[in-house]
Amino acid sequence: MYASRAYPHYLHLAVDFAGSHYSQMTPCENLRSDVEAALAANTELSTCAVQALLIYSIVLFSRDEIEDAHIAFGRCAEIALEIGMNRADFASSRHPENSVEAESLRRTWWELFVADVLMAIPLKTISFRCSAVSPEVPLPCEESLYTGNCELPEPRKVLEFKRRILLEEDVVFSSFSYRIEAATILGRVLVLNRLTDYHRDHLQAIENALVSWSNHLPMEKMEIVDPYGNMDEMMFQAHVIIAHASMLLHLPRSRFYPLLSSPQDDFMPYTHLHSSSASTRLVQSIKAMNASRRLSDYISLCPNIQKHTPFIIPALAMAGLTQLATSKNHSEECFDHHYNRVTLVLGCLKKMKRTWHLAEPAYHRVRSCAARLISDLMDKLNSEPLSKSAVLTQSTPRESEENNSPTGSRTSGCASSASARARPQFH
């Protein structure tokens, strides 16, 4: 394929380097040196250089080589902006007779946009490169169209997507479009968390955006798995990004934060803490808990964790930590619900760390936190009959009823009915 399409060798190497992490036969480190040397020797400013550097930077980030990843990504974004990939007509002018090639370039730009936000999560200072320019590039189409063998339709504009809220009927956009909006909201959360001072309205505006994202989803995009068991990976990632953004926003302002935060903790949200009332912290705790529960629900629907982007690793770690903190503030009746979700997260991280080193510290952080927070309660409940445990883990009537509602609005029986019982325990 590379020879027939005349792709440069450095792009071939970048793809091989990414794929080598899924194979036990290929020496990753040798390929890393090869692709690094090839990219360093390349002097052309081209879309292929952008694509190779984007792949390379994401792989480095997933290997927990954060500093090198940001250096590579910075060069990638610099080239993309210099050649004008952010312009509305860039892709179509490069490939006026080939809609698939033009779509590939639009997707490259928007993947840059999303990666720019996701790679900023562990940083203490943020300097977004791609979201600093006006959103001129048309939106990507649906995955099924892109991978098909037909001519692609005229791409839709970002303004069309934004104006959908003014229409009486739902207008369905591509799953990639909702993922882009999710990343935009996440970027707003990251910026807010790093402000030393802000008005309460700024926080409320982002809370409104998080809720509105779900409320404006058409029915076709509320679920991430269709009736035939096919998964929509773009919508899966979009839902995970929104859940992660919600945890990043609410957890630092909740009563859970003192239980989990520690110096130099890369997995907790970086923010300047502000004083708030006990009732406000309680509400923030419940919102963080619900976001972590939703994320674990998405993972349970799509359990083949190796098929998912390694960008979900920080979200998994935060979901596990939030569930652990919740278990300390809820009654023992709820413990099994939280324990099962923590077990799910640990299993996913354990499996992902075989491929991506970024999951290694995440796994050990959640595991060590679990050993500290719930080990004693596990010992206590282990002495009880198994039949009692089975009764406690049955769904409550509220849970059974709400599990039939759309994924985005489900609330577990523990998270709803038990939250009221647990409120006095938030002292």
Q: Model segments located where?
A:
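Charge-rich, intrinsically disordered regulatory segments
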Residues: 1-9, 106, 116, 126-127, ...
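Solvent-exposed, amphipathic alpha-helical segments
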Residues: 178-192, 323-326
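C-terminal, low-complexity intrinsically disordered regions in eukaryotic proteins
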Residues: 258, 263, 268-283, 287, ...
